[in-house]
Amino acid sequence: MSIMDHSPTTGVVTVIVILIAIAALGALILGCWCYLRLQRISQSEDEESIVGDGETKEPFLLVQYSAKGPCVERKAKLMTANSPEVHG
């Protein structure tokens, strides 16, 4: 019995399968990391919209992702509520 009983392409296929598995695992980890980072960024933006420096921002999810599409009435109400008042 010699060491070279199997064909040489078996080793190449094994290496390719291992590389694909590593790449898939890396993509999964990268995707989770990006998702968590975006969640953290959107959470800080939501906090800024509640407690801003004098000017409140529109909540991103409220305006763009409602169940029936963009809610124009709610957006208009927010725009008029956030308009700067003139002090004289």
Swiss-Prot record:
Upregulation details from the record are: By trimethyltin (TMT), a trialkyltin compound which is a potent neurotoxic agent that selectively damages specific brain regions.
* Origin superkingdom: Eukaryota
Per the record, the coiled-coil ranges are none
**InterPro entries in UniProt:** SNN_cytoplasm (IPR015137), SNN_linker (IPR015136), SNN_transmemb (IPR015135), Stannin (IPR038747), Stannin_sf (IPR027435)
Keyword terms, alphabetized: Membrane, Mitochondrion, Mitochondrion outer membrane, Phosphoprotein, Transmembrane, Transmembrane helix
Tissue expression: High level of expression in spleen, followed by brain and kidney.
Record-level Gene Ontology MF annotations: metal ion binding
Q: Does the keyword Zinc apply?
A: no
Among Pfam families, the record links this protein to: SNN_cytoplasm, SNN_linker, SNN_transmemb
Annotated membrane-spanning segments are 11-31
Taken from the record's topology, the Mitochondrial intermembrane segments are 1-10
Q: Which residues carry this modification: Phosphoserine?
A: S49, S83
Q: Does the keyword Chloroplast apply?
A: no
Q: Which sequence ranges are listed under topological domain Cytoplasmic?
A: 32-88
* Localization terms from the record: Mitochondrion outer membrane
Membrane topology summary: Single-pass membrane protein
Q: Name one GO cellular component term.
A: membrane
Q: How does it assemble?
A: Monomer.
Family designation: Belongs to the stannin family.
Q: What does this protein do?
A: Plays a role in the toxic effects of organotins. Plays a role in endosomal maturation.
Query: What is the protein name for this chain?
Result: Stannin
Q: From what organism does this protein derive? A: Rattus norvegicus
